[in-house]
Amino acid sequence: MASRRILSSLLRSSSSRSTSKSSLIGSRNPRLLSPGPAHGAAPCGTLLGRVAEYSTSSPANSAAPSSAPAKDEGKKTYDYGGKGAIGRVCQVIGAIVDVRFEDQEGLPPIMTSLEVQDHPTRLVLEVSHHLGQNVVRTIAMDGTEGLVRGRKVLNTGAPITVPVGRATLGRIMNVLGEPIDERGEIKTEHYLPIHRDAPALVDLATGQEILATGIKVVDLLAPYQRGGKIGLFGGAGVGKTVLIMELINNVAKAHGGFSVFAGVGERTREGNDLYREMIESGVIKLGEKQSESKCALVYGQMNEPPGARARVGLTGLTVAEYFRDAEGQDVLLFIDNIFRFTQANSEVSALLGRIPSAVGYQPTLASDLGALQERITTTKKGSITSVQAIYVPADDLTDPAPATTFAHLDATTVLSRQISELGIYPAVDPLDSTSRMLSPHILGEEHYNTARGVQKVLQNYKNLQDIIAILGMDELSEDDKLTVARARKIQRFLSQPFHVAEIFTGAPGKYVDLKENINSFQGLLDGKYDDLSEQSFYMVGGIDEVVAKAEKIAKESAA
């Protein structure tokens, strides 16, 4: 009991002293009060002093008037303070550059772009950290070779801003919006910052709607959602580039929309090949007809520093957002490869000294990817539908990078080498490709039942292939023989001549309407075309062309 009385008296003594001190300090400057460490040593020791000060400072803090929340609280805004201020480089570590400013008024906010002065080439830095002592840590958007301490750096007072609008169609830009196709500057009056908020919830379109591509296998079995995100899986040489170009062409013709291709960590050779193929196929037009081009390209090549590769996806998305929001377009955004986006952010995170997370990835993996993916959506004005090529490291689907990406996808389109070896193009695997849109509540009973019927026939054929390889077709039952015959016709009917491949194949491209597509495959499942040969189903558009081709083959064989 005696010890309790002593402790109680000590607390009262400390409280009275702290209260008197607090009132004195508070009368001079009430803002100096905080529930932090004691202003002076308490006679009863550090712990009792902290307890006493906390008990006395809390009422003072609660009495202070609470500031009203800002009108746009939670919304990302940019304080353009410090524009024109000059800092100096004080440290260079690879792609990370530290810059010191003279005073706090010239200090740039996070995500502000800075430009190095008196440098042989334009070098832009993006502010990432405030280190204290008026020093900011930045990420370089280009190589830092030749950069030395003491070099002047200009605060632009704005984030990285890139040109947008129709002037970008048919052009190739880098992460900063600078043209890299040697065709002169991009003349436009419209510019937007690459760091922007996702559309507000009230601006989003709530309905689910198919984006018709005119490609039979996609529209029937793995339809794309308007404003959705599609993962494109495929190795080299299976027709990924041709499929991308056909999607660009068909969306432009059917919906009047534009496309944006963002090469993230792209091989320079592949980027150049894509550009040349787009010119040959008419997706991009040069000279006086440039305004008729259907696609803008934004490249951050594999040899670029990690800062550029981490931001080039945002640059491409910003160009697409302008077409959606300002022009009300249905835009296709291609990102090749979304894994390289994650990889580049991981490199930047390591350079900034963050502690790595699982498998060495950055601790902000989910938020980095989410900031990009949440901006890809449908609004009441227009839509951005994204097709993202995905590299899976060591074919491990549980790797954090692809696993985080899968959570955002609405559909997957898998290109199969086995199907391409059969000469069936597009080589989309009808059994591995999936879509959230494949539901009777969204597509309707007719479309859903036809799609599931086609998949059932193809799956049964796949199960019978081992028996056929060992025993031959003669050992199958009549029902199984009919299943095999229909499955082989369906396989070939899923092939389709592309508009962008006309210059290679000589066959005119075909755009197949969704309703015609469903009716054609339903007729196949019902056995209406069992008497037609397999060959007549290969590389045609609708079922009418199949019948016409079968008649032509019959006449040629009769002659």
Curated annotation (Swiss-Prot):
The main enzyme category here is translocase
Family as reported in the entry's similarity comment: Belongs to the ATPase alpha/beta chains family.
What's the protein here called? ATP synthase subunit beta-3, mitochondrial
- One CC-aspect GO term: plasma membrane
- Where does the transit peptide start and end? 1-54
Catalytic activity field: ATP + H2O + 4 H(+)(in) = ADP + phosphate + 5 H(+)(out)
Any matching Pfam family: Synthase_beta
Phosphoserine found at: S62
Q: Compositional bias (Low complexity) spans?
A: 1-28
**Function, as annotated:** Mitochondrial membrane ATP synthase (F(1)F(0) ATP synthase or Complex V) produces ATP from ADP in the presence of a proton gradient across the membrane which is generated by electron transport complexes of the respiratory chain. F-type ATPases consist of two structural domains, F(1) - containing the extramembraneous catalytic core, and F(0) - containing the membrane proton channel, linked together by a central stalk and a peripheral stalk. During catalysis, ATP synthesis in the catalytic domain of F(1) is coupled via a rotary mechanism of the central stalk subunits to proton translocation.
Q: What Enzyme Commission number does this protein have?
A: 7.1.2.2
Q: Which residues make up the binding site for ATP?
A: G234, G235, A236, G237, V238, G239, K240, T241
Residues of the region (Disordered) are 1-39
Q: How does it assemble?
A: F-type ATPases have 2 components, CF(1) - the catalytic core - and CF(0) - the membrane proton channel. CF(1) has five subunits: alpha(3), beta(3), gamma(1), delta(1), epsilon(1). CF(0) has three main subunits: a, b and c.
The cellular location(s) given in this protein's UniProt record come to: Mitochondrion; Mitochondrion inner membrane
Any coiled-coil regions, as ranges: none
Organism of provenance? Arabidopsis thaliana
Q: Which GO terms describe its molecular function?
A: ATP binding; ATP hydrolysis activity; copper ion binding; proton-transporting ATP synthase activity, rotational mechanism
Q: Which InterPro entries match?
A: AAA+_ATPase, ATP-synt_VA_C, ATP_synt_F1_beta_sf, ATP_synth_F1_beta_su, ATP_synth_F1_bsu, ATPase_a/bsu_AS, ATPase_alpha/beta_chains, ATPase_F1/V1/A1_a/bsu_N
Name the UniProt key words of this record, in alphabetical order. Answer: ATP synthesis, ATP-binding, CF(1), Hydrogen ion transport, Ion transport, Membrane, Mitochondrion, Mitochondrion inner membrane, Nucleotide-binding, Phosphoprotein, Transit peptide, Translocase, Transport
